[in-house]
Structures are given as structure tokens and as C-alpha cells.
Amino acid sequence: VLAYIAAQVCSVLKCDLILWFSDTGLEFPELKKHVKSFVEYLKRIYTGIHIELVIDYPKDKNGKRISFRDVILDVGYPIISKEVAQKVEFARSKPDGYCAEAFDPDSDYCKKYPKNCLKRWRGLLEAPFKISSKCCDIMKKKPAKAFEKMYCLKPILATMACESSLRRNDWLKNGCNAFDRGGRQRPISKPMSFWLEQDVLEFIHINNIPIATCYGDIVEKDGILTTTLYKRTGCMYCMFGVHRELQPNRFQILKDTHPAIWDYCMKPVEEGGLGLRDILEYIWVNSE
């Protein structure tokens, strides 16, 4: 949707449009295919502007491509939410810090900020595997910032405040266009921050915009627009928020739609897989 809107604006202003995509290896095969076909679709509609697709990859300091498996073995698994995963990681590294206090209901921190108390996830501190929120930073944000710096460009993102508490708080603090945040924070535009999922589906439906086949079709049920297959795609292996999903959850659906990928996800790390089965069992989530 954002690419479509940006192309409309660029068509009016007669300026070039650069669409940047990080091929992390976590995207659905249908989504990766759609990225290229959608750019060709935009070029057919907006013939008066130059539209360029840049496909990038997450790399280490030596230029070697980084995989999700590299990330989980190095820093840990992304589970529950970015906030919880980050606090678990910090609490483990500094047991006497405020992040550790967030898991103790009797601590001064939890008494002062009861809404921020994470006692429900206290058991994660003793989990027999690494936990981290750094996956998105490594796989998407770091290569994006490197691209921005190299070509002196500023990003326009399609993130929405309704997607997480962190994004909601960021929107409330900075608004849609945060060009003067100061410090080390880069200028950034998030014009869809106030959109809801229904707004996105309605915009696609009204403008007859093609979507990746993994979503299926957009249909109306009881006055609400929805997709017939996946509701969200994101990263196939990510476990953020899966504990809140009704069954069938994303991994149960993945087993039906992409069995080979599901097998790789669940296979133990020692056998070359990602070892997600044990992680999901630890947080009481069914994987099949």
C-alpha cells in the first residue's frame, strides 16, 4: 500500500521512487516473488517516473550474508514481544539491574510501575536457550541504515501504531513525520502510523491492488474485511506474539501451506534446523 501511495506522489511531483527490500530469508516464497512483480505493476501504471527496486541482504562486518539461524545461535530467539525479549536479555546480563526487577513483583520497580511488571514471564530468565530482541535490528534495520547512509536517503516506512505498544508509543511521541528527533535517531517518515488493518484492506480492495498469493483473497465477513489465507506474513520464523494467537496459529498453518519450511523450523539445531519446536513448547504454544 505504501509503495502504491508513494508512486502516486512521485508521479505528481515527477521524481524517482526507490523501493528498498531486505531479503532476509525469512519471507514467504510468495512474498519474495510478489515484490518483483509488484514493482513491474507500478511501472505499468506510473509510466512517467523511474521506479527502482533495490534488493539488499543482511551482512556481517566481513560482507558475509547473515541467516536467521546465525542470529538465534549468536544472540538468541525472538519470543513473546520485543519488549519482553529485550528485558530478558538485559536481566540475564545484569541480574541486579532494573530489567531484572521488572520480573519480580515484590521489587521497587514493579511497585512503582505495576503496568510494566513482567512477573508472568519470570520463568524465561531460567529458560535453557538464548532470548533476544535483536533479530529485526540485525536482519532489517542495520542493512536499511547502511543503505540510507551510503546513498544519503531518508526512509518512509509502512509501520502502524496498532501493531505494537512500542510503535504506538513512538507515534504518540513523534507523530508520523519525525525529522528532528535529535541525537543518534535518524529522520524518518511513517505516514501510515494512524492506519488500522481495516484501512489497509479497504484501500487494497477499492483500488484493486494485487497482493501476494499467501494472503489469499480479500473478503467481507460480518461487515469486516479479512483475507482468506494468512492475515499477516512478516517473518516466517518469528515467534513474537504467537502465544496470543488462536488455533490454528501461524506455525500450525505453516505446516499445511509450507510443510518443508515447517520441517526446517522444527528440526533440532543439532540436525541443521532452527529448533523452534522446543522453544514453542516452553512457552506453551502448539506447533502442529
Predicted regions and their residues:
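ATP-dependent adenylation/nucleotidyltransferase module used to activate substrates
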Residues: 1-199, 206
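ATP/NTP-dependent adenylation/nucleotidyl-transfer catalytic domains that generate, transfer
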Residues: 184-185, 193-288
